[in-house]
């Protein structure tokens, strides 16, 4: 039934981790196989893989590129692959037409210069080279191994020393247009005076051509600025989306922190404030001490409410038993036995606070009530009130006719008196009470007192000696094998001793004897969580809540007597199952939705 126990403890920490689901983005290439589109696809994918899936997919970028039929400018988010790559010529064929027009215009100007320069071959070559220099800014080179300007100048000088003037002109034509300014200087040094005057007119024509190129360059800069603004806007929106996702993850982390705090609070189960003055005041009423009666109890005028309550307790109907006991107390506030059974039933119904108040009131009315003293010691232990638990167990010895002489004999011992008079909780106080119980057990010899063994088991539980506590409870069970409360205490000790598998067996035995034992059902769910059987844990918690509600509905009780820590444990189990929609139902207290989800009868 609890097949998940092998990985239980190891999986609890892993279940609390916040996982982010990532999705691989498919890479697509342009159908036209343009270099620009291919490069843009690669760059966007590289950028996409560097952060979570929070930005638009690569398809969005490709669609925009195809629709605009232009290339995206190189921005800070885009890597430059080569220094000689001009993206504009790859996507705008219009610029080639403009270049040809400017080339023809420059050629016509060059021909006019030839007529004015007496047909000199050198001037013709120089004018043609200047026309190439004008076309240089509008032309891109895909060559990655371009010579530097200084190397080209050295090449020109080297060939000039060894070859004729005609060979010099041919070599200069093979150089890149990027050396235009230096070539103009070289021409001016080797020309005659008429050639220089002709060169001035050529420079004037070059200035005019540059002015004609300013407008297209500014238009291109404006378009690039617009593209850059669009990309910056996109990046800004992506940053906002990332911040929203980050906030969602942080809220998810807060959820797990809240679950951890709730788990620790449930483990402490320390909801009772220590009020020593209220404990010593016998004349204080029950309502003033914190017990809250059901305001609309349908049995408040029921004749023989106490006897009817005992009958319902044997049947295992704990919520209705509580109502009958409250009715009996309202009819007779001094009925100590009714307070006793009310406290014991509240503890079995997983309401420790009300149990402690009722048992305290019982002992105020009847200080020698041994059952109330033992039940109060167990409730104090469950709420981590060790000093109060030790005092209750000591009072059990003092009020017991069989063992009270042990306390009188120990009064002559200064060491015991000093240890028992200390108010702070320390090991000496616990050891002093434990010595009393061990001596009482030794006095009994082979005879086993189940109540004494129960008290000894509680003391060993308080000191963390779980194996010895288990032995004490097992000894008590040899005398009372049908005592479901003893089976439950044995299961709790086994669970605290890291023996959850055996604890499940003890709880199961307690529920076989008393199916309506809600505390044992709750403890069984906690052991299932420790074993990693989260679904079984949820089933047990829902069964306990359903039992509480069923009794309330049958008797038409308007105010539910449902334990809050059962709901807290249920939320923890649902969170470990990774069921957010069911966890939300638990937060809303929607028991019907949860029962249907786990196929349980309402």
Swiss-Prot record:
Region of interest called Disordered, as start-end residue ranges on this chain: 94-140, 167-206
Keywords carried by this UniProt record: Cytoplasm, Membrane, Phosphoprotein, Repeat, TPR repeat
Residues the record lists as Phosphoserine modifications: 181, 229, 233, 237, 421, 423
Tissue: Brain specific.
Localization per record: Cytoplasm; Membrane
GO CC annotation, single: dendrite
TPR repeats: 302-335, 336-369, 371-403, 450-483, 485-517, 519-551
Membrane topology classification: Peripheral membrane protein
InterPro entries reported for this sequence: PEX5/PEX5L, TPR-like_helical_dom_sf, TPR_rpt
GO process terms (BP): maintenance of protein location; positive regulation of corticotropin secretion; protein import into peroxisome matrix, docking; regulated exocytosis; regulation of membrane potential
The family this protein is said to belong to: Belongs to the peroxisomal targeting signal receptor family.
Function: Accessory subunit of hyperpolarization-activated cyclic nucleotide-gated (HCN) channels, regulating their cell-surface expression and cyclic nucleotide dependence.
Name of the protein in question: PEX5-related protein
Lineage: Eukaryota, Metazoa, Chordata, Craniata, Vertebrata
């Amino acid at each position: 039934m609890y097949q998940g126990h092998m990985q239980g403890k190891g999986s609890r920490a892993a279940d609390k981790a916040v996982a982010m689901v990532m999705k691989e983005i498919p890479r697509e290439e342009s159908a036209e196989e343009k270099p620009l589109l291919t490069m843009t696809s690669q760059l966007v994918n590289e950028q996409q893989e560097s952060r979570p899936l929070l930005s638009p997919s690569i398809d969005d970028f490709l669609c925009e590129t195809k629709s605009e039929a232009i290339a995206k400018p190189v921005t800070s988010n885009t890597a430059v692959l080569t220094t000689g790559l001009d993206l504009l010529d790859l996507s705008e064929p219009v610029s080639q037409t403009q270049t040809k027009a400017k080339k023809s215009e420059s050629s016509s100007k060059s021909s006019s210069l030839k007529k004015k320069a007496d047909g000199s071959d050198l001037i013709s070559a120089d004018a043609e080279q200047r026309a190439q220099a004008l076309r240089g800014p509008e032309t891109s080179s895909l060559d990655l191994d371009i010579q530097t300007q200084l190397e080209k100048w050295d090449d020109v000088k080297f060939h000039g020393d060894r070859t004729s003037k005609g060979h010099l002109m041919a070599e200069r034509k093979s150089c890149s247009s990027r050396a235009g300014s230096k070539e103009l200087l070289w021409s001016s040094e080797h020309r005659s005076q008429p050639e220089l005057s002709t060169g001035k007119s050529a420079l004037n024509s070059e200035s005019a051509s540059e002015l004609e190129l300013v407008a297209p360059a500014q238009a291109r800069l404006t378009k690039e600025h617009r593209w850059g603004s669009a990309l910056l806007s996109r990046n800004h929106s992506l940053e906002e989306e990332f911040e929203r996702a980050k906030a969602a993850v942080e809220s998810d982390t807060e959820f797990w922190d809240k679950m951890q705090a709730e788990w620790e609070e449930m483990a402490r189960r320390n909801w009772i404030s220590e009020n020593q003055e209220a404990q010593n005041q016998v004349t204080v009423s029950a309502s003033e001490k914190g017990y809250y009666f059901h305001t609309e109890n349908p049995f408040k005028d029921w004749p023989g409410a106490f006897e009817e309550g005992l009958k319902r307790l044997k049947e295992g109907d704990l919520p209705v038993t509580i109502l009958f006991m409250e009715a009996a107390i309202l009819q007779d506030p001094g009925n100590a036995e009714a307070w006793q059974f009310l406290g014991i039933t509240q503890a079995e119904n997983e309401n420790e606070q009300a149990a402690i108040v009722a048992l305290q009131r019982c002992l105020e009315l009847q200080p020698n009530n041994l059952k109330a003293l033992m039940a109060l010691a167990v409730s104090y232990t469950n709420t981590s009130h060790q000093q109060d638990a030790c005092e209750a167990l000591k009072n059990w010895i003092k009020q017991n006719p069989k063992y009270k002489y042990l306390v009188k004999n120990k009064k002559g011992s200064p060491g015991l008196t000093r240890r028992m008079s200390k108010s702070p909780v320390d090991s000496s106080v616990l050891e002093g009470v434990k010595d009393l119980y061990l001596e009482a057990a030794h006095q009994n010899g082979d005879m086993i007192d189940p109540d004494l063994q129960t008290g000894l088991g509680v003391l060993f539980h308080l000191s963390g000696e779980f194996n010895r506590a288990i032995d004490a409870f097992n000894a008590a069970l040899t005398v009372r094998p049908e005592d479901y409360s003893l089976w439950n205490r044995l299961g709790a000790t086994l669970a605290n001793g890291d023996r959850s598998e055996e604890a499940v067996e003890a709880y199961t035995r307690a529920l076989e004897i008393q199916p309506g034992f809600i505390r044992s059902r709750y403890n069984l769910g906690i052991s299932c969580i420790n074993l990693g059987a989260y679904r079984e844990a949820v089933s047990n918690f829902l069964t306990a809540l359903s039992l509480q509600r069923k009794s309330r509905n049958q008797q038409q009780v308007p105010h539910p007597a449902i334990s809050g820590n059962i709901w807290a444990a249920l939320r923890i189990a649902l969170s470990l199952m990774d069921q957010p929609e069911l966890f939300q139902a638990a937060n809303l207290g929607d028991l019907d939705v949860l029962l249907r989800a786990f196929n349980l009868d309402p």
